[in-house]
């Protein structure tokens, strides 16, 4: 009985950590250079899972996505119902130029029809791009992303320490 009482705090702490990691926040490591210059290979991020769903997914959020057997980190560019295109390194949403207020690499021209053979992004789907556009494996190659495959939003960078803090979109 004394052993059970002595070990109970450890069991409760371990259970709490498992619950938090499973349902609230999860650490994720940036793999590759597709999000440069904003995120770098080896950066350690915290992904918020709880409360992140279709009602609060916003353009330019940095999200963790299940893509096959791996998790990838990309930026939300297109939302359901929108027509997206890039011309001369400018983002067009429903034929209007939209400023991207973050650092990204040159984007080759493309339009939504090349990605999904559709005029607008279907309900429950999102267009994502990496910030390092010339090398990123994103919606231009893998197609639109299902809402169910968006695991969470990257909210904090915890490594390297010199860049510790919120991830602003």
Residue ranges of predicted features:
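Soluble "head" domains of membrane/secretory-pathway proteins
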Residues: 3-4, 11, 18-19, 23, ...
């Amino acid at each position: 009985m004394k052993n059970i009482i002595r070990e109970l705090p450890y069991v409760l702490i371990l259970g709490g950590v498992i619950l938090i990691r499973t349902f609230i926040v999860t650490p994720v490591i940036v793999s590759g250079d597709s999000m440069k210059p904003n995120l770098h290979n080896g950066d350690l991020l915290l992904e918020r899972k709880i409360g992140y769903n279709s009602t609060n997914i916003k353009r330019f959020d940095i999200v963790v996505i299940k893509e096959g057997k791996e998790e990838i980190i990309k930026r939300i560019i297109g939302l359901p119902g929108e027509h997206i295109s890039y011309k001369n390194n400018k983002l067009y949403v429903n034929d209007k130029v939209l400023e991207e207020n973050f650092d990204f690499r040159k984007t080759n021209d493309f339009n939504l029809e090349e990605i999904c053979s559709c005029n607008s992004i279907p309900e429950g789907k999102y267009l994502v791009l990496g910030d390092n556009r010339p090398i990123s494996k994103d919606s231009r190659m893998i197609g639109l992303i299902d809402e169910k495959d968006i695991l969470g939003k990257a909210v904090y960078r915890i490594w390297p320490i010199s860049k510790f803090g919120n991830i602003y979109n």
